[in-house]
Design a protein with these regions (language model features):
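N-terminal catalytic or cofactor-binding beta/alpha core of small enzyme domains
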Residues: 2-106, 111-130
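Conserved small/polar residues in nucleotide/adenosyl-binding loops
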Residues: 131-135
Length: 135
């Protein structure tokens, strides 16, 4: 297998249908497996919830962020209804995350546009958030 094929496998998007009872368990198990493979040493895990309630269909991230914050989530949460992370402050928030956390594992939560057949699906992808350190 060449490097390009390996990268494609690592970035494979998995789809979960929330109307199927076993999907939550399947996605949880997969996410735990991914987190275990990424967490080494003292790497912290943060949850980056992207979106705004000011745009129709874009409130998933801040809604999840608010729910996690109110449930005393073990991970640091960025992006809530009160303090949303959106297009205008996303880059600054990512810089802040990488400044406050050394080599963090970032779980990003965001609504997305996609194919009609994917409406309502929850996706999980092991991929990188793009961040370029200022020179």
């Amino acid at each position: 297998m060449n490097i390009t094929d390996r990268r494609r496998m690592l970035r494979r998007t998995e789809y979960y249908n929330p109307t199927i009872t076993s999907s939550a368990d399947d996605m949880s198990a997969r996410m735990c497996k991914i987190l275990k493979s990424l967490r080494s040493g003292d790497r912290s895990t943060v949850v980056l919830c992207i979106g705004t309630d000011r745009a129709t269909g874009d409130a998933l991230g801040p809604l999840v962020g608010s729910l996690l914050s109110n449930s005393q989530c073990a991970y640091r949460v960025y992006g809530t209804l009160q303090h949303p992370v959106h297009a205008l402050n996303l880059n600054d928030t990512i810089k802040k995350i990488y400044t406050e956390h050394q080599y963090p594992v970032v779980i990003a939560v965001d609504a997305s546009l996609g194919h009609r057949t994917d409406v309502g699906m929850v996706t999980l992808t092991k991929a990188c958030l793009l961040y370029t350190s200022p020179s």
